[in-house]
């Protein structure tokens, strides 16, 4: 049976111009045996799905393509692909054939040779040069007339400037070989350049930027009168020139791409969230994440891309292992929402200070070390930890993500101030797109692994460029077909970006502030408690005033009883008077104590007055007791005793009047102010 199958397979492939090797033959026969395929139908499917643009293709790839087309789950898995920086394909431009050629066996070591450093700059320059020469402004027609030729310009090599008079256009990398002197370099030489009088309008120019300068070469110095960044190229034009070369990585085959485009249009509700600066060690940030997940629990996003830094402060000196605890806390929050846990793909991009196995902040940055995230991955299987920068392919769209504070860096190192007519973010994006590089600062300012500089390339331009920056949110839609955006810092204002790939629309949102609402409620409770305390104090004061009035009424009633009252009533009357005076003294002391915060001198005088009144009252009370004892011993002196008693009462009343006159009226506003 196997021999008959082999003959039939060999004959079918040879009729279509293909030859099949022994290992491919074995793979097909195993499929027929194990899965019961009809051999004729299987061969037809294989031949239909062979990519004719490639001369060599594996049978395993064809089977994978067939399974992908026939399975909706496989399409969903193929919809999102993450390409880390160290798996980015390398293509070198061949100046002779004017094509990009893939380099299969390039040096992948982190510590490149000296040639790697020089090749780094050459590759950057050639990539921009070939694109600029194809620009309409520099593409002179072959059979053009002299008049028509004057409408076009050419890029003059720097080595041809000597003895070549007139206004010229040059393209080169600006550098500073000598202090206070700028140079412009190309592949062969460098010349001094004077930019003091140059007109510059759009973009940012830093040391190491590739610029296009116009001017004259005089006495060994190129006097530039105009400087601009190289022209960009529309994405569709670049793809047409590349002739289906996959410089991005993980590009699916034609049949799969058709299915992915169909899937992309059908899934209109699929969304991708972008968050930057997600501090997992901050309680308030975790609260906002919890609140954010709660808002998407019924309609989970297709993917969530979380960019570092993942801690507020760098974890150094042995504290790196705390990151494991923080990711476990995040896993617990995600597990609270089953839909998000089941359907959302989480992608983590490290920030500048995150521990990634290297103490040096060199680009590309490695993923977060597995020792910190292995528990998280076991709890959240649909999670991917990738490099910084990284590339993401969603169906037919290519996305580049880079987490760095580029705005501040470029401002510090710019040598030509950008115009104020546009936002600084527009100048930054123009620099990135025109130089086809994410960060073209000097290697001293921003070190890069020499052998992996191609991972920082932005050529061809992606559909979406995401820069995770601490600056304010921005989004720019460019004429060349690239959409750029910055979700801003989630830890600062809890802002994030909501992207819908089906219609390429962005929505900027902010996580609500539940803790602030709680704080507002707490503030309201405190205000209510203060009001209640004020009301209680007012009620106490009213009760005290009522007690005073009642005591005064009782005293007046007892004063009117006259001589007919017996000695026991006299003692009760005197005791009531003493209690009344004591209450007044205590009340007065309390008021003085509160007023002491406002005016200490007046309080001291009032306290002394109150003490004098207290002493006088005690003396009157002693005299009163002595008179009562004398009345008990001598009943004959009853009239004298009554007169003495009346005299005592009159004296007490006079003292009370003096106290009331001396006592300042209570300022209720000040008292309420003091209580508050």
UniProtKB/Swiss-Prot annotation:
Its main location: nucleus. The keyword Lipid biosynthesis does not apply. Residues 513-676 are annotated as: Disordered. Residues 551-561, 667-676 have a biased composition (Basic and acidic residues). Residues 517-550, 562-575, 633-643, 651-666 have a biased composition (Acidic residues). It comes from the Eukaryota. Consists of three subunits: pole, pole2 and pole3. This is DNA polymerase epsilon subunit 2. It comes from Dictyostelium discoideum.
